[in-house]
Curated annotation (Swiss-Prot):
Coiled coil segments of this chain: none
Phylogenetic lineage: Bacteria, Bacillati, Bacillota, Bacilli, Lactobacillales
GO biological process: translation
Name the UniProt record assigns to this protein: Large ribosomal subunit protein bL33A
Species of origin: Latilactobacillus sakei subsp. sakei (strain 23K) (Lactobacillus sakei subsp. sakei)
Entries under SUPFAM superfamilies matching the protein: Zn-binding ribosomal proteins
Length: 49
């Protein structure tokens, strides 16, 4: 089952990315390096509820 998730920047805490994931394949929270427009650099983004 695919679920909608929001990605939050770990440095500025801005929620700038929406995505979806398969909970069966990825039961834990996703952590991806993405571009943060507020910081203007690539930072670690974590999944939020």
């Amino acid at each position: 089952m695919r679920v909608h998730i929001t990605m939050e920047c770990t440095e500025c805490h801005e929620r700038s990315y929406l995505s979806n994931k398969n909970k069966r394949n990825n039961p834990d929270r996703l952590e991806l390096k993405k571009y943060c427009p507020r910081e203007r650099k690539v930072t670690l983004h974590r999944e939020t509820k």
